[in-house]
Design a protein with these regions (language model features):
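Flexible loop and strand-edge segments within Gram-negative outer membrane beta-barrel domains
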Residues: 19, 24-31, 50-99, 113-138
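Surface-exposed extracellular loop regions of Gram-negative outer-membrane beta-barrel proteins
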Residues: 67-72, 115-117, 172-175, 243, ...
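Structural signature of Gram-negative outer-membrane beta-barrels, strongest in the C-terminal barrel
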Residues: 56, 152-156, 162, 186-261
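Transmembrane beta-strands of outer-membrane beta-barrel pores
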Residues: 16-20, 57-61, 100-102, 111-115, ...
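Structural signature of outer-membrane beta-barrel channels/translocons
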Residues: 1-4, 42-46, 95-101, 148-156, ...
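Repeated loop/turn-to-beta-strand initiation elements of outer-membrane beta-barrel proteins
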Residues: 8-10, 48-51, 102-105, 115, ...
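Predominantly transmembrane beta-strands of Gram-negative outer membrane beta-barrel pores used
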Residues: 1-29, 36-44, 52-56
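Hydrophobic, lipid-facing positions within transmembrane beta-strands of outer-membrane proteins
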Residues: 1, 35-39, 55-57, 88-94, ...
Length: 261
């Protein structure tokens, strides 16, 4: 607990690997370092309301062991072609839950991102130009609101809306010989788009909860292309039937059609 009333709790951890020390002793030509962390914060705002914040991520670094004394041919080969790299990733999310007699309301916001960088210098000398320079970033942001009703005329209903955005960026630079001349190849790629969704499921049990029916419908749209703007063109229906004909046996059947983003 991090509050006096005990309604707010925090759980967190961090780890770091020291493989670079072991690899250095073994005389390996690369020295990795790995780090990861995670946390969860939960706060009860009242008898019916709760807020939570969660996250996990990592950041890693792999550098070359250029301090090797008298490296053999295998070590020289690896040092000659292997680039150094840094990469990191994380997922953060926050949510609010309001519970009431007939069900609950949940709102969730999240973001995840990944970054990767590769680079190498001539003869592993950082004062010389880079022979490889690669950078990529991608991220995804989402928001979702969902309501669950446990009894609507004997039915159970879940429905909601959501949306978000995605981004991808890649930049690459490297020297290349073309027609006997040295030039720098450049590659740049960027992509950004939005997304939105609607979804609902309706279910009910019959015959003393031995037979159940679930009907679901989902609609997805995105700004990636004009053909995908209208969510009514990307409808994903689903039907599931389940029958418990013996205490240890249940027969289930489902049919669905899904559109993948």
């Amino acid at each position: 607990p991090v509050s006096k009333n005990g309604k707010t709790t925090l759980l967190a951890s961090y780890r770091r690997s020291y493989l670079q020390m072991l690899f250095s002793v073994l005389g390996l030509p690369f020295l990795p370092t790995y780090n990861d962390y995670q946390f969860k914060l939960t706060s009860k705002l009242g008898a019916s309301d709760e807020f939570y914040l969660i996250g996990l991520g990592s950041f890693d670094y792999n550098r070359l062991n250029t301090g090797l004394k008298d490296p053999d041919d295998d070590q020289k080969y690896i040092l000659g072609y292997l680039p150094e790299n840094r990469q990191s990733s994380y997922v953060f999310g926050a949510g609010y839950v309001h519970r009431f007699r007939a069900g609950q309301l949940r709102v969730v916001v999240s973001r995840n991102a990944f970054t990767n960088k590769l680079y190498k210098h001539e003869r592993n000398d950082k004062s010389l130009p880079r022979t490889i320079d690669y950078n990529t970033e991608q991220s995804d942001n989402r928001v979702r609101a969902e309501i669950e009703l446990r009894s609507v005329g004997g039915f159970r209903f879940t429905g909601g809306v959501g949306g978000g955005s995605g981004h991808y960026d890649n930049t690459t630079r490297r020297p290349a010989y073309t027609g006997g001349q040295l030039r720098t190849e450049r590659f740049d790629s960027r992509l950004s788009f939005g997304r939105y969704e609607l979804f609902a499921t309706l279910s009910r049990e019959f015959f003393g909860k031995r037979f159940s029916v679930l009907l679901g419908l989902r609609a997805d749209g995105t700004t990636y292309s004009s053909e995908m703007h209208n969510p009514l063109r990307q409808l994903s229906p689903r039907l599931n039937l389940s029958y418990n004909f013996r205490p240890q046996w249940t027969f289930s059947a489902s049919v669905a059609r899904y559109y993948q983003e």
